[in-house]
Amino acid sequence: MPHTVATPPPLLQVRGISKQFSGVVVLKSIDFTLQPGQVHALLGGNGAGKSTLMKIIAGILPPDTGVIEMNGQPCFNLTPAKAHQLGIYLVPQEPMLFANLSVQENILFRLPKHQADKKKMAQLLKNLGCHLDLSVSAGSLEVADQQLVEIMRGLIRDSHILILDEPTASLTPAETHRLFSQIRMLLQQGVGVVFISHKLPEIRQLADWVSVMRDGGIALSGATADFSTEDMIQAMTPEAQKGALTDSQKLWLELPGNRRAQSHAQSQQPVIHVHDLSGEGFAHISFHVQAGEILGLAGVVGAGRTELAETLYGLRPASTGNVILEEVNITAMKTANRLAAGLVYLPEDRQASGLYLDAPLSWNVCALAHDRQGLWTQPAQEAAVLERYRRALNIKFSHLEQPVRTLSGGNQQKLLIAKCLEANPLLLIIDEPTRGVDVSARSDIYQLIRSIAEQQVAIIFISSDLEEVVQMADRVLVMHQGEINGALSGAAMNVDTIMHMAFGEHRSASEPQGGTASSAENKGASC
C-alpha cells in the first residue's frame, strides 16, 4: 500500500474573521493563508480593512468571529506579547518608536536577554546595508530610517511571520532594493511575509500571491502572475475614477477669502524668493516659486529636503540667507507669523506632526485657520467647514466628533490637506503627500493639488516617488547632500535624470526659468 506524504499546514491560516466597530462592519468573514517562504501581498483602498485584519493577526485587536491558526494549531486570545512569542511581528505603517531612546534600545526593547544579541543586531544591519548610528535617539532619525528600525525589531525577534505595512513608503530605490534582498534571504529560511503596499510594480517584483480587499471583504485572490495590473486596480475600485475633480468639487474647494483676489494678485513677483539660505542639513539654497506653479523638490533620504522645508516654515533656524514671501522678508519671523502671512506646511508624518489624533475631525480641520477667534468653540461653523471639505475631497467618516485616529490613512491625509487649505495659503509646502495612501486616493490627491495650483497658490512638492514628482511638477530642483545639484524642466525632467542627479551626478539641463544645473552654479543664484 503506497504511503501518502501529508501536506504540511500553512504557516498562517485565517478563516471566517469578522469585525465591526460601533455597528459598522469593517471585516466580513475573511479567509487568508500564508505559506512558509511566501510573500503574500495585500492590496486594497484606504478603509478596505487591511490594517484591521493585520492588527487582529498581530493580537492588537480581537476578532468578533473566526479562527486564526499557526502551523495547523488554533491560536486563541492573541495579545501582542503572545503573537511575538509565536513569531508574528507587525511592522506598522507609521513608525512607533520611543523618540527619547537610542536606536539600539528601541530595537532591543522588551526583548528577552537570550535574544538581545548585539552581534546579531550588527550583522542584520550589515545584511540590510544600513549605516545607522545605534547610539543616537530614534526621534532624531528621518522617517525612512525609523521605518528600518521597525523592521529590525521584527528581524531580531526571529519572526516566522513578518507583516510589513507599507514598508517602502519612505524608502529610496536603493533602500527598497536592499530591503527586498533581505526579504528574499528570510524567505529561504522559511519565513512568510505579508506585504501591504499600494505600489503595484513592487508587488509584481516581490509577491508570489496577492489578495485584494474591498469594503471589508476579499475581492480577488490568487497567484500574482495570474492577474494584470488593471485586474488589481478594478478589484480595489470597482467604479472607474474620473480623471479630474468635478465642477461641484472644485466649487466646494474654493479657498476661503482667497488671498489671490486681493490687490497683489496680479503681481509678477515670485510668491517666495529664497536667497543663499543655509541651515542644519543644507547650504546655499536659492530658488523662487511663482503663483500657480508646482515646484518639485527631489532627492534621496538625507538630502536635506525636509530640513529645508521646516526651515522655510520656521521650525528650524536659518544660519545665513533670506526668505522673501510676497516681498516681505520673513527670515526672522516665528512660525505663527509665517502662517499668518500665508506660508503653510503639510508635514511628511501626518500622525506625529500634522493631526491631533484623539481630537474630533471638525476641530482638526479648523486648527490652522488664519482667523480662529471663537471658531473652534462654535460647532456649527466647524461642521460647515468640515462638510465643505468632505464634499470637495470625498473624505469618508461617520460623524463630526469621530477621532482622527479612526480614519484610514488616505482619509487622514485628505483631512490634513483640508486643514492646510483652511489656513488660506499663498505658498503650500507639501512633504510626501501620498505616503501610505492607495492608488485611488493618490489620484484624488494629485487632482486636488492641481486644483489648488489653479487657484494661484504656489506649491513646493516634496516626494521620494520620482514618478509622481515628474507627473506633478512644473519644475524640479534636485538636492544632493544638502545642496541643489541641478534644476530641470520640460523634456529634461525625467526619472532617470533625477535619479542620477539625486546621487550626485552632474548632468546638463535646460532651465528656461533661470534655474541652475549644479550646486556650484546655484550658490547665491536664483532659479
Swiss-Prot record:
Pfam entry (one): ABC_tran
GO molecular function annotations of the record: ATP binding; ATP hydrolysis activity
EC number in record: 7.6.2.13
Principal subcellular localization: membrane
Family: Belongs to the ABC transporter superfamily. AI-2 autoinducer porter (TC 3.A.1.2.8) family.
PANTHER family in the cross-refs: AUTOINDUCER 2 IMPORT ATP-BINDING PROTEIN LSRA (PTHR43790:SF2), CARBOHYDRATE TRANSPORT ATP-BINDING PROTEIN MG119-RELATED (PTHR43790)
Superkingdom in the source lineage: Bacteria
Function: Part of the ABC transporter complex LsrABCD involved in autoinducer 2 (AI-2) import. Responsible for energy coupling to the transport system.
Residue numbers binding ATP: 44-51
Keywords from the named record: ATP-binding, Cell inner membrane, Cell membrane, Membrane, Nucleotide-binding, Repeat, Translocase, Transport
Protein name as annotated: Autoinducer 2 import ATP-binding protein LsrA
Compositionally biased tracts (Polar residues): 510-521
Its membrane topology: Peripheral membrane protein
Limits of the ABC transporter domain: 12-240, 266-506
Subcellular location per the Swiss-Prot or TrEMBL entry: Cell inner membrane
UniProt-listed Gene3D superfamilies: P-loop containing nucleotide triphosphate hydrolases
Subunit record text: The complex is composed of two ATP-binding proteins (LsrA), two transmembrane proteins (LsrC and LsrD) and a solute-binding protein (LsrB).
Stretches for region Disordered: 507-527
